[in-house]
Design a protein with these regions (language model features):
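Beta-sheet-rich non-transmembrane sensory/scaffold domains
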Residues: 18-729
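Secretory targeting and sorting signals
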Residues: 2-19
Length: 729
């Protein structure tokens, strides 16, 4: 806890320096920020030789940039002609990539093939998720509770549940009778702050939390150790029981003061410089604390040892990106960390390398009133490479950057030692007419990721919606009005080429190999103007790279699937030729999963819902206009004695003209003879709190399909989808 005591001392010093000279807002901690124009992305990073050098580096850079409002006081905004505006940077979701070949498809089964595994990007590189199985038990985390369900008998049995630490985004790995749960929390959960309400945690500071859970007694699962690391948890990967956890940290415990008027700025600047001068190593470098089962501190220290910290030759910000190594086969410890002074957002790992990428805006020499194109052109992607071969600590290897922004984890892939990156030029929200997408191939040379090949001119005026790298081939989907699927030949990394292209309406935001030259896309259908109309799954024949074809498709109007942004929600079970997609429709109120068959094209095999026992049934004693109900909205005419209301819907009485206008907004025309000004009219729309719970994941054990929702687990027969069992949470 030394870090927080030092923080309190610095705050007292700052208050003493400024209390008589100026009026300030309440002293509070803000995330350190700075003028992004001063950032230079230098590819070669060098390690520090001592802790004094680390502290001196941070102090010198901060003293050069601190002002009366702290370190630049926040992001810089620009206003463009036409009213568009943009923030300084945009984060992409964390994730991974794939080196699977099309011929094999993507394995998702357990070691014996009798159950499905997590839908990972790289076979053998596990990813944490909210559900895991070994074929005999199903472990899941829903609403912060870890549940253990035994599925070895005739009936599934919920043996135990454990309330986890307050936080969010709980995901876990399992190794034998132990689970390692990763989550994002805040400092309220740390004993020092929880025990004394007078001590407020630093404003905006978050912690990454790892909890080791003993599963040996399912009736009495216990958290035996907890590791807390300063910063935001990005992602983790596990290879042969060795976990690499990636965290991005920033110095958010600098209690800068702020002047109440212009005349006090000099005094505030002096106070803020004093705060930086008084800062310690723990102020800048993230710390960890390890607790035992009773919440007592076991050990604490810096996440990254000083000689394992790396910095660029020129200023690159105050963030620390750390990769911590944990061993699943032993008790949870502090781990061995490696770090670079840089930001991190998107994580990808092969069996031997881990990459962390960041979308960054570099606004050097931007005019005071830039146009949109000038702003968009300044987006870059910075990438840092770490060696994770073996079970030792990760080793920093190289860095590099390219123009443009990447979409997510699938934009990165390592093959034969080279890194392939798919990016779109410009800002993530931009649809510039001359923008294009490209694939760039980087290789490591003397600590630098250098470009050795590229292919562009994909999707003019569009941006990437999905990418899948499969061996020497990449599949790229761009979209604005139509969905071009590009097939890219990467067999020659120095001279990649686009070998084929297919244009169809809509887009795929997730691509999955099915083997035998088949590729499945999940996304949205769209009309000729690019307006999305509902969820869509498309089966592509890509056996001829020069002539990709759409074999068949399946759609559901006014709906979406979590698979569009969460690949872990996807299930492909090759032994039964099925794909399972969670589906939510905002018009028909369908909440469940759709099972598609892939053995002869693409066809719907059935639907699964976790039907609630207390769900109100459809129906009303009023006259329902069926034509409106089909669009997801119910408009009904009620007599004076009618109770009104519609089961499972929220109803509100409206004047006839307003009801008709609302119906038109939903795409339904109501004729004059259907509504009269004197009528009592009720407008009803789906109340999802009363509907079926959303299905989040699915898995297969033997001949049973299991699905997970907030409400519990449900077992359906693979053959026919008959409901077999339910385990309610």
């Amino acid at each position: 806890m030394r870090r927080y005591l030092a923080l309190a001392a610095v705050m007292v010093m700052a208050m003493t320096a400024c209390s008589r000279a100026e009026s300030t807002s309440p002293i509070r901690s803000l995330g350190a920020s700075f003028d992004p124009r001063s950032i230079t992305f230098t590819a070669i990073l060098t390690p520090f030789d001592a802790c004094d050098a680390v502290l001196a580096h941070f102090k010198a850079e901060a003293l050069e940039r601190v002002g009366p409002y702290g370190l630049d006081g926040g992001p810089r905004w620009y206003f463009f002609e036409g009213g568009a505006r943009a923030q300084e940077d945009t984060a992409g979701p964390p994730g991974d990539g794939s080196v699977t070949t099309m011929a094999a498809g993507l394995p998702t089964g357990g070691e014996d093939g009798g159950f499905s595994g997590t839908n990972v990007q790289v076979s053998g590189v596990d990813e944490p998720d909210i559900i895991k199985t070994d074929g005999e038990r199903i472990l899941s985390i829903v609403d912060g509770k870890l549940r253990y369900v035994d599925v070895t008998g005739d009936e599934p049995v919920l043996l135990g549940e454990l309330q986890l630490e307050t936080g969010w985004n709980h995901r876990f790995f399992v190794d034998g009778d132990r689970a390692f749960v990763f989550s994002q929390g805040d400092l309220d959960a740390i004993p020092m702050f929880a025990a004394d309400s007078r001590i407020a945690p630093p404003y905006g500071m978050t912690v990454s939390v790892v909890q080791e859970v003993d599963l040996s007694d399912p009736d009495d699962m216990q958290v035996v150790r907890t590791l807390r690391v300063d910063g935001s948890y990005l992602s983790a990967r596990s290879i042969d029981g060795v976990v690499r956890m990636v965290v991005s940290s920033y110095p958010s415990n600098l209690p800068f003061v702020y002047p109440s008027n212009e005349s006090a700025e000099d005094i505030a600047l002096a106070a803020n410089r004093q705060i930086i001068e008084a800062s310690t190593l723990e102020t800048w470098v993230p710390s960890y604390t390890l607790y035992d089962a009773d919440g007592d501190e076991v050990t604490s220290g810096l996440v990254v040892a000083c000689d394992r910290m790396h910095r660029p030759a020129e200023f690159a910000g105050f963030d620390t990106l750390s990769v911590t190594t944990l061993d699943l086969s032993g008790s949870l410890g502090a781990g061995n960390g490696t770090g670079v002074i840089a930001r991190g957002e998107t994580v990808y790992a092969s069996h031997t390398s881990l990459y962390v990428a960041t979308n960054v805006w570099i606004p050097e020499n931007v005019s005071d009133t830039p146009d949109f194109q000038e702003f968009s052109e300044r987006y870059e992607t910075a990438v840092h490479k770490f060696d994770i071969a073996g079970d030792g600590p990760a080793t920093y290897r190289a860095s590099g950057s390219i123009d443009g922004h990447l979409l997510n984890q699938f934009s990165l892939d390592e093959f034969d030692g080279d890194l392939r990156i798919a990016v779109t030029e410009g800002a993530p929200w931009s649809f510039e007419e001359d923008s294009e997408s490209k694939i760039v191939v980087l290789t490591e040379r003397d600590g630098v990721l250098v470009e050795i090949g590229s292919v562009g001119n994909m999707g003019k005026g569009e941006r990437i919606y999905s990418v899948r790298f499969l061996g020497e081939t990449a599949y790229v989907v761009t979209f604005r009005q139509v969905d071009p699927l590009y097939v890219v030949d990467l067999s020659d990394p120095e001279s990649p080429v686009v070998s084929g292209e297919l244009k169809i309406p809509g887009y795929s935001s997730y691509l999955h190999p099915l083997g035998d030259g088949l590729l499945l896309g999940v996304g949205q259908a769209a009309d000729s103007q690019g307006r999305t109309t509902g969820a869509k799954a498309t089966l592509f024949d890509v056996s001829d790279p020069s002539d990709p074809r759409e074999l068949s498709s399946w759609t559901i109007a006014d709906a979406y699937s979590d698979v569009e942004w969460e690949h872990l929600a996807f299930l492909y079970w090759a032994p039964a030729d099925i794909v399972v997609l969670p589906i939510q429709s905002w018009m028909t109120q369908f909440m469940g999963a759709v099972v598609l068959k892939t053995d002869d094209g693409l066809r719907e095999y059935g639907r699964i819902t976790h039907q609630r026992e207390d769900r109100p049934g459809d129906g009303s004693d009023c006259e329902v206009l069926d034509s409106v109900k089909e669009a997801g909205l119910v408009i009904q005419l009620c007599d004076e004695g009618d109770d009104g209301g519609y089961g499972g819907y929220y109803c509100e009485p409206l004047p006839a003209d307003e009801a008709a206008a609302l119906a038109r907004d939903w795409g339904v025309e109501v004729s004059d003879d259907q509504l009269d000004a004197a009528d009592r009219v009720e407008v009803c729309w789906p109340n999802y709190e009363l509907g079926d719970p959303q299905i989040m994941r699915s898995l297969v054990i033997g001949d049973t399909l299991w699905t997970l929702s907030w409400h519990g687990l449900q077992a359906n027969a693979l053959d026919g989808l008959e409901v077999l069992h339910k385990v309610e949470f």
